[in-house]
Curated annotation (Swiss-Prot):
The modification 2,3-didehydroalanine (Ser) is found at residue 254. Changing residue 533 to A: 16% of activity. One of its GO terms (molecular function) is histidine ammonia-lyase activity. The lineage of its organism: Eukaryota, Metazoa, Chordata, Craniata, Vertebrata. It comes from Rattus norvegicus (Rat). This is Histidine ammonia-lyase. The modification Phosphothreonine is found at residues 396, 637. Gene3D superfamilies: Fumarase/aspartase (Central domain), Fumarase/aspartase (N-terminal domain), Phosphatidylinositol 3-kinase Catalytic Subunit, Chain A, domain 1. Belongs to the PAL/histidase family.
Length: 657
């Protein structure tokens, strides 16, 4: 029998339909009738017949014709909205749809699985789980560990042992023993009371990451959750039913209690949930629409679901992956700028970096050589100024290996900490099945990821700081020898004048965001939890800084490509021409002023999707396989015996040099 979930005046109603030949109008009237039946005053209506309404899908908000047959117009379990005409309690939008969160009109249920064991999840895996590319299953070893852990909890309950969080209250109430008949109520109360976050909800991608990471940590078998409950949580994830999780409210110890409580609240059928099928609705209806039942918590299971650093760490995973992507592409963008400004490649000589062998510095210098080596990739632009009188470039060009390099090393350091945290048990108390006991500790404290993500923000910010200075050099005619602000008919046109201001504003804002949040701490829970990490803010502001970096580099990418226009018909190296072609596939050259924000967004999207890296990476890797490490690429300003031999009829003897 088909069934539909209908929203009427803020209420969600499940309406079964025995006959698919019934109409959309019948569904609307039946929903209104059920709404009136549940209200003492019939909702203010005298009869269903007097109610005039429209019906539309929650997904996409498409209006339906009241005469259409249900079996034709709707799918089983679809969510619809009844909009009552002229009714102030029935606005022309869905009240439960939070700002900034939209339905996935193109969502496709994944077919592939990732097997979680609590020990081997990577940052890349978690980001892909967040994007909905995979479903989850447990390894057989993980299932066994979870079962063994639960047996310890069951034994504690049976023997009526006093153990924190299982038979006692929480925090300041740790010495309050709870009667056996109240242990399940204790867990539900915990989830409800701790669901006290504020702010906008996490996006579906971030909520999916949060849920997947909590599943991975529970799969380690140190939290005492039952295998039955954990499998229910996995079913919810695989159906993409996602709780309403406000982004603010965690102090990062004892774990991320508020956001994880909101996550658990939806699992027990309370609060709001979202799915691609339903949009936002009451959690119990979203679960029912996917054939799922609310989880009934057993003793310890509420605590098992909410105690840990998964909010900090899941956002940290996204930050690390996005930082890695933009750091790689920053080298390509800077190389293009160097070409436009007719810089020298001599600063990327292998010997310079061999005597200061930081891993990131060496790799960045190599990438510049692979993109700019005029022996490997002839450049007409480089040849045009081979014998100019320049000796060396400004720091923003010459010192890219040193500045970009430390960013790469910072990301690697942070990624190592975040990866360890991904696969760590962060509950309290911990259940050690091999010892048959629980131990209270402090693994829930978020200081590790908090400090790491503060460091990440500081490190990655420098990519934007140096990029903004390169944008200045591109736009300033006294430095670039190009038209002011990269546009013809300056004065009539302003070109990149304010795009550069935008970059400067983003860099300035990020400087404030780079103030480390983990240096702060406030005592909470009546001084029981008297030192906290503030890691939630560290993670959120790291993501904001990284977004600013992406946007600044998007502006530099556009500016560099526009600079190329004024050097035509000369060509740059083959890999950089491919980058130019990529940008021109989404943004045309500026002949005169036009609305610039969409172009910045288009370039930002190329960087987010790693398209710039995709077109350049094959050339970088080919160069890696073919180049001779000791070789030194000829530069427009290189001065060496070899260059003299190639370019001069008279070569001085070595004794005369």
């Amino acid at each position: 029998m088909p069934r539909y979930t209908v929203h009427v005046r803020g209420e969600w109603l499940a309406v079964p339909c025995q006959d698919g030949k019934l109409s959309v109008g019948w569904l609307g009237r039946e929903a209104v009738r059920r709404y009136m039946k549940n209200k003492p005053d019939n909702g203010g209506f005298t009869s269903v017949d007097e109610v005039r309404f429209l019906v539309r899908r929650c997904k996409g908000l498409g209006l339906l014709d009241n005469e259409d047959l249900l079996e034709v117009a709707l799918e089983d379990n679809e969510f619809v909205e009844v909009v009552i005409e002229g009714d102030v309690m029935s606005p022309d939008f869905i009240p439960s749809q939070p700002e900034g969160v939209f339905l996935y009109s193109k969502y496709r249920e994944p077919e592939k699985y990732i097997a979680l064991d609590g020990d081997s999840l990577s940052t890349e895996d978690l980001v892909n789980l967040g994007k909905g590319h995979y479903k989850i299953k447990l390894t057989s070893i993980a299932e066994k560990k979870v079962q063994q852990s639960r047996e310890v909890i069951d034994s504690i309950i049976k023997e009526r042992t006093v153990v924190y969080g299982i038979t006692t209250g929480f925090g300041k109430f740790a010495r309050t023993v709870i009667p056996a008949n109240k242990l399940q109520e204790l867990q539900v109360n915990l989830v409800r009371s701790h669901s006290s976050g504020v702010g906008k909800p996490l996006s579906p991608e971030r909520c999916r990451m949060l849920l997947a990471l909590r599943i991975n940590v529970l799969a380690k078998g140190y939290s005492g959750i039952s295998l039955e409950t954990l499998k229910q949580v996995i079913e919810v994830f695989n159906a993409s039913c996602l709780s309403y999780v406000p982004e603010k409210g965690t102090v990062g110890a004892s774990g991320d209690l508020a956001p994880l409580s909101h996550l658990a609240l939806g699992l027990i059928g309370e609060g709001k949930m979202w799915s691609p099928k339903s949009g936002w609705a009451d959690a119990k209806y979203v679960l029912e629409a996917h054939g799922l039942k609310p989880i009934v918590l057993k003793p310890k299971e509420g605590l098992a679901l909410i105690n840990g650093t998964q909010m900090i760490t899941s956002l940290g995973c996204e930050a690390v992956e996005r930082a890695s992507a933009i750091a790689r592409q920053a080298d390509i963008v800077a190389a293009l700028t160097l070409e436009v400004l007719k810089g020298t490649t001599k600063a990327f000589d292998t010997d310079i970096h061999a005597v200061r062998p930081h891993r990131g510095q060496i790799e960045v210098a190599f990438r510049f050589r692979s993109l700019l080596d005029s022996d490997h990739h002839p450049s007409e632009i480089a040849e045009s100024h081979r014998f100019c009188d320049r000796v060396q470039d400004a720091y923003t060009l010459r010192c890219c290996p040193q500045v970009h390099g430390v960013v790469n090393d910072t990301i690697a350091f942070v990624k190592d900490i975040i990866t360890t945290e991904l696969n760590s048990a962060t509950d309290n108390p911990m259940v050690f099945a091999s010892r048959g006991e629980t131990i209270s500790g402090g693994n829930f404290h978020g200081e590790y990821p908090a400090k790491a993500l503060d460091y990440l923000a500081i490190g990655v910010h420098e990519l934007a700081a140096i990029s903004e200075r390169r944008i200045e050099r591109l736009c300033n005619p006294s430095l670039s020898e190009l038209p002011a602000f990269l546009v013809a008919e300056g004065g009539l046109n302003s070109g990149f004048m304010i795009a550069h201001c935008t970059a400067a504003a983003l860099v300035s804002e990020s400087k404030a965001l780079c103030h480390p949040s983990s240096v702060d701490s406030l005592s909470t829970s009546a001084a029981t939890e008297d030192h906290v990490s503030m890691g939630g803010w560290a993670a959120r502001k790291a993501l904001r800084v990284i977004e600013h970096v992406e946007q600044v580099l998007a502006i530099e990418l556009l500016a560099a490509c526009q600079g190329i226009e004024f050097l035509r018909p000369l060509k740059t190296t083959t890999p950089l021409e491919k980058v130019y072609d990529l940008v021109r596939s989404v943004v045309r050259p500026w002949i005169k002023d036009r609305f610039m924000a969409p172009d910045i967004e288009a370039a930002h999207r190329l960087l987010l999707d790693q398209k710039v890296w995709e077109v350049a990476a094959p050339y970088i890797e080919k160069y890696r396989m073919e180049h001779i490490p000791e070789s030194r690429p000829l530069s427009p300003t290189a001065f060496s015996l070899e260059s003299l031999r190639k370019n001069s009829a008279t070569i001085p003897e070595s004794d005369d040099l």
